[in-house]
């Protein structure tokens, strides 16, 4: 495989996610993948002809029926296989309501995307919250202040 082909392969496997908040809640997706039900943010693979920003906006539209605009980049995580995962803070108009959309790459009678909903941090499991912190949620207005109000107790299994 040539270097150009390797880079093209890695680029297609890279992902972008959209962090959308409203009134102290985070737009989340309830999904069932690999035998596990969990919550995550809208996002997916970057197509060959798009930027990470364009991918985040496209995934938000496909999966949640929302038209958003990038506010700013939050994080870039590099995976061991060379792929990258980009996260962006995204704003949506106040008059738009999320709907459960689709993932055009997932076909069949039982798609993984089950529901789209607004959730507060205390409604999200610690495991799923860990991914939100990795995506840069603490940089989004209001969420760092919420974390400062939390206690110092250890609440996860030892």
Task: Go through each PLM region and give its residues.
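Conserved hydrophobic/aromatic beta-strand scaffold that supports enzyme active sites
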Residues: 28, 87-89, 118
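Short loop segments at secondary-structure junctions
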Residues: 23-25, 32, 91-96, 121-123
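Conserved Nudix-box catalytic region and its N-terminal flanking loop in Nudix hydrolases
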Residues: 22-62
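Nudix hydrolase/Nudix homology domain
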Residues: 36-37, 100-158
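Active-site segment of metal-dependent pyrophosphate-handling enzymes
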Residues: 65-105
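Conserved N-terminal beta-strand and adjoining loop/helix that marks the start
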Residues: 3-27, 48
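Short, P/G- and charge-enriched loop/turn segments at secondary-structure junctions
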Residues: 2-8, 102-107
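Short hydrophobic/aromatic beta-strand or adjacent loop that forms the aromatic wall/cage
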Residues: 13-17, 83-87, 113-116
């Amino acid at each position: 495989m040539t270097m150009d082909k390797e880079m093209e392969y890695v680029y297609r496997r890279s992902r972008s996610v959209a962090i959308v908040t409203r009134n102290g809640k985070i737009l989340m997706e309830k999904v069932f993948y690999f035998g596990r039900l969990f919550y995550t943010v809208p996002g997916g693979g970057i197509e060959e002809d798009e930027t990470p920003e364009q991918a985040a906006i496209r995934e938000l539209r496909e999966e949640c029926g929302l038209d958003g605009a990038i506010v700013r980049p939050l994080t870039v995580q590099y995976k061991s296989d060379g792929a990258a995962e980009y996260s962006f803070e995204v704003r949506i108009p106040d008059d738009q309501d999320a709907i459960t959309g689709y993932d055009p790459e997932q076909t069949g009678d039982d798609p993984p995307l089950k529901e789209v909903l607004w959730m507060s941090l205390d409604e999200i499991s610690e495991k799923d919250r860990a991914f939100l912190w990795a995506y840069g949620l603490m940089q989004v207005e209001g969420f760092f202040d919420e974390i400062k109000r939390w206690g110092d107790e250890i609440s996860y299994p030892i």
